Design a protein with these regions (language model features):
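Short, basic phosphate-binding NTP loop
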Residues: 1-11, 27, 320-334, 344-346, ...
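Flexible, charged surface loops at secondary-structure boundaries
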Residues: 110-113, 256-264, 287-292
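Conserved catalytic-core segment of NTP-binding enzymes
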Residues: 122-204, 265, 270-343
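Canonical P-loop GTPase G-domain recognition
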Residues: 185-225, 229
């Protein structure tokens, strides 16, 4: 069944950045398709965007397009992007384009092709309010019910979900329920029950929880290499190795040794050969060390000496050379830690299995509502 007459929709929002909204979108979309549904996707408003076929597209829309081989036009998947300086132009009256009309036009065209639309928001409910396109505004514009995604704990996710639900309700948007991500079920198996009871006091159904998985919070070395686009000095022994943590090593070697943990990716100036040598030797002395580094991101554009480079190769440790100071390089690494990329096949498969095995997909589908007739 396709066409606007039968199309239904869901809007997936979050309580903030990096709460797991895109992870949930990806997993749910896969689950919808697994049920044989002709599902379509749209990210109505995007803040972080790239160019695909000379057309700007939000990064999350690009991810979904790449993972699921979506054939809809890029402009439908990502109708509105917010580039740098755009907010100022809107406030100063320099933007006259009807952005809401672009979003509705994309919805109408997608609804003609698909029987179910998954709409993904940007950040918390109020993001975009400055230009009149907050998540609450957009959900109201599209007439879509909202599912709110938050992350682990008890008090904080409930507080955040209730706060965001209030803004959606103020715009007349139905809050269909909530999903809580990164829940430590092994440590606190009672959390789902407490979350369900806590949210029920505010009239918000808990639609499920997603257990914490390290691979979903930590990328592989291959993703770091691809995302940083630096000069790879040595690939190391396993590009699919999962990074346990990121350590910035700008102190004396003995202090570094106290701070790095297992499977650490170490961001260190390339001219701190004392630090690099001490950490590299943890792989060369024939002993088992719990804090052996998984790899190096060398900042400052400083290439280590031939002697130290040979140590890295002998130890078979990943190393990439980056321009920029240590802070800016570490910030780039952090951005990569919290994003999913089309090339990360292992992580994507884990997401699909986690969502299908943890959430009641039929119950979530029951929350979908018809796309309004325009």
């Amino acid at each position: 069944m396709t066409g606007a007459a039968g199309a239904r929709q869901l809007f997936l929002a979050a309580t903030g950045q990096n709460r797991g909204k895109t992870t949930t979108s990806l997993g749910l979309f896969a689950a919808f398709r697994a049920q044989g549904l002709n599902a379509g996707f749209m990210k109505p408003v995007g803040q972080r965007w790239i160019t695909i076929d000379n057309t700007p597209a939000d990064e999350d829309a690009a991810l979904m397009r790449g993972v699921f081989d979506l054939t809809d036009a890029v402009a439908l998947l990502s109708p509105v992007q917010i580039p740098r300086g755009f907010t100022r132009k809107v406030i100063e009256g320099q933007v006259v384009e009807d952005l809401g009309a672009k979003i509705i036009a994309a919805q109408v065209e997608l609804a003609e092709k698909h029987e179910l639309l998954l709409l993904e928001g940007t950040g918390h409910a109020g993001v975009g309010a400055v230009i009149g396109l907050s998540n609450a505004d957009v959900a109201a514009l599209l007439g879509a019910p909202v599912i709110i995604v938050s992350e682990g704990g008890i008090g904080r996710p409930i507080d955040e979900i209730v706060l965001n639900a209030a803004l959606f309700a103020a715009r007349g948007v139905e809050v269909a329920g909530a999903i809580v991500n990164k829940v430590e079920l092994d440590l606190q198996p009672e959390l789902p029950r407490l979350l369900e009871r806590g949210l029920a006091r505010h009239g918000i159904p808990l639609l499920g929880v997603l257990p914490y998985r390290q691979i979903l919070s930590n990328p592989t070395l291959a993703i770091i290499e691809d995302g940083l686009q630096g000069e790879t000095l040595w690939p190391g022994r396993d590009m699919d190795a999962i990074i346990g943590r990121v350590s910035v090593a700008a102190m004396q070697p003995e202090h570094v040794m106290q701070r790095i943990g297992d499977s650490a990716l170490v961001v260190v100036p390339g001219d701190r050969e004392d630090v690099i040598e001490v950490l590299t030797n943890l792989w060369l002395d024939g002993k088992e060390h719990p804090n052996r580094p998984l790899g190096f991101v060398l900042s400052g554009g400083y290439r280590p000496s031939a002697r130290v480079l040979e140590l890295i190769r002998t130890a078979n440790i990943f190393a990439v050379l980056m321009e920029g100071d240590t802070y800016s390089v570490a910030a780039k690494v952090h951005d990569l830690l919290v994003k999913t990329h089309p090339e990360d096949l292992r992580k994507i498969e884990e997401i699909k299995q986690l969502v299908s095995g943890s959430l009641d997909v039929d119950r979530i589908l029951a929350a979908a509502r018809p796309v309004p007739t325009r």
